[in-house]
């Protein structure tokens, strides 16, 4: 059985929890979704989801609690949405603590402020999907020399989803839809990692 930890610090935590449980049910696998807040809890997870919220605050808490060290030391796969995307990168356009486990540079609030939030049809993993964008970041750049990096989706010319190894960073909020496919994809990555 695998354990997917939803980092319960800020953002759409309950929505991520609910859709992760639904994805697990749809996949018919032995797995559980749990809420995690501390490093010792994260250490017991096979994968971690970092939701949206204020990336500066989440980054500070992750560092203060040693969650970043546990994730890095145990090579735990991470799925970051919105602020989670910012935190996964090694660089951003703002001085803040980062998890820095992906060779990407992220631009915060690239699609505007809260009032500029929108939904848009996108294609991800070769399938149609509805992207929900709320103060969404975008990818500024990534290390094109890394063979384990793949772009998963773009909106116009902006990269909005990228994967490196078993880590996935996306700019939008799949937890605010009823569509479990992206969460299922992450869970598959976790399964591939623990096998």
Curated annotation (Swiss-Prot):
The keyword Ubl conjugation does not apply. One of its GO terms (biological process) is pyridoxal phosphate biosynthetic process. Keywords: Glutamine amidotransferase, Hydrolase, Lyase, Pyridoxal phosphate. InterPro entries: Class_I_gatase-like, PdxT/SNO. PROSITE patterns: PDXT_SNO_2. SUPFAM superfamilies: Class I glutamine amidotransferase-like (SSF52317). The active site is at residues 82, 173, 175. The keyword Hydrolase applies. In the presence of PdxS, forms a dodecamer of heterodimers. Only shows activity in the heterodimer. This is Pyridoxal 5'-phosphate synthase subunit PdxT. It comes from Methanobrevibacter smithii (strain ATCC 35061 / DSM 861 / OCM 144 / PS). The lineage of its organism: Archaea, Methanobacteriati, Methanobacteriota, Methanomada group, Methanobacteria.
């Amino acid at each position: 059985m695998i354990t997917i930890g939803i980092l319960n610090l800020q953002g759409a935590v309950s929505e991520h929890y609910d859709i992760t449980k639904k994805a697990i049910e749809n996949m018919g696998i032995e797995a559980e979704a749990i809420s995690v807040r501390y490093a010792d809890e994260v250490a017991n997870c096979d994968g971690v989801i970092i939701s949206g919220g204020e990336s500066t605050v989440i980054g500070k808490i992750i560092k203060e609690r040693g969650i970043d060290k546990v994730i890095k030391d145990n090579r735990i796969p991470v799925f970051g949405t919105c602020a989670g995307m910012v935190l996964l990168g090694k660089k951003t356009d703002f001085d803040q603590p980062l998890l820095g486990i992906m060779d990407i540079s992220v631009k915060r609030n690239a699609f505007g402020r809260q009032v500029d939030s929108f939904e848009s049809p996108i294609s991800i993993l070769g399938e149609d999907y509805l992207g929900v964008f709320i103060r969404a970041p975008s990818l500024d750049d990534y290390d094109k020399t890394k063979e384990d990096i793949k772009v998963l989706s773009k909106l116009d010319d902006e990269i909005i989803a990228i994967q490196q190894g078993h880590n996935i960073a996306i700019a939008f909020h799949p937890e605010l839809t009823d569509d479990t496919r992206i969460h299922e994809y992450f869970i598959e990555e976790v399964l591939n990692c623990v096998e």
